UniProtKB/Swiss-Prot annotation:
UniProt protein name: Lactosylceramide 1,3-N-acetyl-beta-D-glucosaminyltransferase
UniProt signal peptide: none
Glycan attachment points: 57
Documented EC number(s): 2.4.1.206
Membrane topology field: Single-pass type II membrane protein
Function field: Beta-1,3-N-acetylglucosaminyltransferase that plays a key role in the synthesis of lacto- or neolacto-series carbohydrate chains on glycolipids, notably by participating in biosynthesis of HNK-1 and Lewis X carbohydrate structures. Has strong activity toward lactosylceramide (LacCer) and neolactotetraosylceramide (nLc(4)Cer; paragloboside), resulting in the synthesis of Lc(3)Cer and neolactopentaosylceramide (nLc(5)Cer), respectively. Plays a central role in regulating neolacto-series glycolipid synthesis during embryonic development.
Tissue spec: Highly expressed in adult spleen, placenta and cerebellar Purkinje cells where it colocalizes with HNK-1. Expressed at lower level in brain, lung, thymus and muscle.
Top-rank EC class of the record's enzyme: transferase
InterPro entries documented for this protein: Glyco_trans_31
Lumenal-side segments: 35-376
Keyword Protein biosynthesis: no
Length: 376
């Protein structure tokens, strides 16, 4: 009996020890977790107000005496889409030194001739960039000029190409579209490490064109996101720049598409708001909020993560983010004819449904396609 009681006491002490350790750990780690959770809960609670009322826009509006900075073009192709029926005007945000990325895109999803001959669509693709920093010198600029003389697909304005000038690059894109290609049915902007399944995208946009879609803006939507107040983060936004606890809804800058009428409205709004907000996708959300445009979430536009590699995923994919070395291999695999046949028939549909559930419905956060994309 004593032995039994002794064991129970020992087990209770061990249990008490682990409970104490858990509580202490919880107390130590709860503060940053709590701050993160509370920050997002607070920002999401403000989301309706930020999206519905004009006080945010009023606080960011330019004074009548102020104008947006205007940078001259160093490289331009004003004739790129003149007198043509353009389905899609696609800007790729790139850095001067990223020649390898531009080259891979030209050989894969960014090949205009492929889209014209194989997909029966006229699209125009331009790489948008600023100037090399002072440390990179004139040599890189000379190489850019030489590259453009070969491919004729670069537009460049005279601002330093850097993270804090992303909004200047945003203004370059929408200004160019408004000035030189306002008749394009759709405008898309994408990073240079993105993969776009061009056959799927073109088929989707052609269907939308036929029904005359308007007020259209799709991508991977961030809802009620809070400004980052951590000074060590590159996304840090001081209160002086943006004092509200939540941003208007916006799409991830990795890739999004807007219709022609939205592109025109965004350009007009961009000329009235303070462009010191250097996070370009947030600035896009501010412009859209001013003109009453809300983004639509598309489950096959990825966030910051790569999609799982599998033909069942490729069947409906639109974009995937973070591709630096595998772009050409992925292009060959994702556009292979077998992809369109893999889910045919009853058993094909069941097979792909199960594969997508396994690949997309994971407990670990991937930031690519959501679980419900497996059922789309």
């Amino acid at each position: 009996m004593r032995l039994f009681v002794s064991r129970r006491v020992k087990r209770w002490k061990i249990f008490h020890f682990f409970v104490t350790c858990f509580i202490l750990s919880f107390m130590v780690f709860w503060s940053p977790i709590n701050n993160y959770i509370m920050s997002h809960m607070k920002s999401y609670s403000y989301r309706y107000l930020v999206n519905s009322y004009g006080f945010v826009n009023n606080s960011l509006s330019l004074k009548h005496s102020s104008v947006q900075p205007h940078y001259p073009y160093l490289i331009n192709h004003r004739e790129k889409c003149q007198a043509q029926d353009v389905l899609l005007l696609l800007f790729i945000k790139t850095a001067p030194e990223n020649y390898g990325r531009r080259s891979a895109i030209r050989k894969t999803w960014g090949n205009e001739n492929y889209v014209q001959s194989q997909l029966n669509a006229n699209i125009k693709i331009l790489f948008a960039l600023g100037t090399p920093g002072p440390l990179k010198g004139k040599e890189l600029q000379k190489r850019l000029i030489g590259e453009d003389q070969v491919y004729k697909d670069i537009i460049q304005q005279d601002f330093i190409d850097s993270f804090h000038n992303l909004t200047s690059k945003f203004l370059l894109q929408f200004s160019w579209a408004n000035t030189f290609c306002p008749h394009a049915k759709f405008l898309m902007t994408a990073d240079d490490d993105i993969f776009i399944h061009m056959p799927n995208l073109i088929e989707y946009l052609q269907g939308l064109e036929q029904i005359g879609v308007r007020d259209f803006w799709i991508g991977h939507v961030h809802r009620g996101g809070p400004p980052v107040r951590d000074k060590s983060s590159k996304y840090y936004v001081p209160y002086e720049m943006y004092k509200w606890p939540a941003y208007p809804d916006y799409t991830a800058g990795a890739a999004y598409v807007v219709s022609r009428d939205v592109a025109a409205k965004i350009y007009e709004a961009s000329q009235t708001l303070n462009s010191s907000m250097y996070i370009d996708d947030v600035f896009m959300g501010l412009c859209a909020n001013k003109v009453g445009i809300l983004p639509q979430d598309h489950v096959f536009f990825s966030g910051e993560g790569k999609i799982p590699y599998h033909p069942c995923i490729y069947e409906k994919m639109m974009t995937s983010h973070g591709h630096l070395q595998d772009l050409q291999d992925l292009w060959i695999e994702a556009t292979h004819p077998k992809v369109k046949n893999i889910s045919k028939g009853f058993f094909g549909q069941i097979y792909c449904r199960l594969i997508k559930i396994v690949l997309l419905c994971r407990l670990t956060y991937r930031n690519s396609y959501p679980c419900w994309a497996a059922f789309a």
